[in-house]
């Protein structure tokens, strides 16, 4: 459709969703690894479901909203598509509304009330492992998605169907309609093969306590953000990945900045990005990284979702984690295929 060809597994995902709906399931998940085109799948919903009513797409970050908007427009050029976020207001006649959860998910939100429940038939959640949060529940309840007789369909997309805080997604979603894992996608040559090196730092994590299924960040930072360990990370990168483009995942902002300094002191072109950084500064760094002016970007939790740079062929886990969700997301930043890429080094 309009130059966006569906891959076989994307066709299968759409067919599986239609089947689930006919079987009476109304809240379902699709699990696809990062980089396998989940946006393309949900952007085909208006066609696949022969949609008569509107579609609402929910995401919690601006990058995800913009990516979704581009795909919806490319695949559905005749539909009116609008974003509802901050100072952008969706026009009432938009057939696809792409909405920011922080904008409409506050209880009593006038902007949520303005979206008439009966006008919508499909609700899509990107990065659905967030869907157990209260802001999402507020939105789901507004649309009556838990009513036993609802005809609306809620579809969540995730690369990792387990949520870190053990709540699980079972209280929101009834079933996983379609799933493919990283191994299958690599075997079918849709993602780059992954190879790994373990570098022993001698750092003991014995004293670091766990909360919500992962290490407590402040305690973890004290142990791993040391000059000696940071320099070891840089040396390992220079030895194992001298010509690769790397993303380095750190514990917190201070660690990301310290890691950046360690790379720079060793002569590696590196910059740090973090959540509170101004949007223009962040975009400038990522543009330099894309162009090759920078070889390494250090960050904490910022590039785990919605960051697409297919040339990344090295992911450095400078932060230990117990979370399968976080680990999968971090690896997923480097698994996209690119002509110049032989494999991903973790």
Segments from the language model and where they lie:
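Conserved pre-motif I regulatory segment
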Residues: 1-31
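Walker A/P-loop
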Residues: 23-46, 249, 273
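Conserved helix-turn-beta segment of the N-terminal RecA-like "Helicase ATP-binding" lobe
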Residues: 63-85
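Conserved helicase ATPase core of P-loop NTP-dependent helicases/translocases
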Residues: 82-92, 257-262, 268-304
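Conserved helix/coil segment N-terminal to the catalytic DExD/H
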Residues: 87-122, 133-138
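Post-DEXD/H (motif II) to motif III coupling segment of the RecA-like Helicase ATP-binding lobe
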Residues: 129-196
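Conserved interdomain linker/interface between the two RecA-like ATPase lobes of SF2 helicase motors
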Residues: 176-247
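Conserved segment of the helicase C-terminal RecA-like domain
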Residues: 324-329, 333-346
